[in-house]
Amino acid sequence: MPANKKHSRRIDRTKAFQVLYSLHFTQINTIETLKEIFLNLPNPLEERNTGIITELDTQISFSWQLVEGVWRNVTRLDKIISQFSQNWRVDRLGKIELTLLRIATFEMYYCPDVPPKVSLNEALELATCFGDEKARKFINGILDAIIKAIETEKINYIDKN
């Protein structure tokens, strides 16, 4: 993957994290409200370089795919996460950790073009930015277990339909 695309995807994940994290503090019942929150959140790339229109368009689409996908599949994602978070109920996880786990798990199951190890590494990078070392280790353990289950075909990609 070219460095520019990798950088853009990290920004996408950052925006998705910010939107999805904010949902812990507000009730969203419609896709329209979710879109409004998404579009009103400042774009990290705009703050750095307002002249890159094509990258902004790309970022919006991948960021939105993550936000909408996690929002629509949160129950499924939480069920998967709970299978691998030994002795931890999903409702007891920290909001940062849970949000990062949901994004990475969504990518692992619904984005076959993204290698699971990339999803794990990106979640760890975001955990470094938004969490602490303890959170990073916790996220690594759960996502690593999910990857091993995918690799041994104990669990499969989820049909999007």
Curated annotation (Swiss-Prot):
GO terms for molecular function: RNA binding. Belongs to the NusB family. Keywords: RNA-binding, Transcription, Transcription antitermination, Transcription regulation. GO terms for biological process: DNA-templated transcription termination; transcription antitermination. One of its GO terms (cellular component) is cytosol. This is Transcription antitermination protein NusB. SUPFAM superfamilies: NusB-like (SSF48013). Disulfide bonds: none annotated. It comes from the Bacteria. Involved in transcription antitermination. Required for transcription of ribosomal RNA (rRNA) genes. Binds specifically to the boxA antiterminator sequence of the ribosomal RNA (rrn) operons.
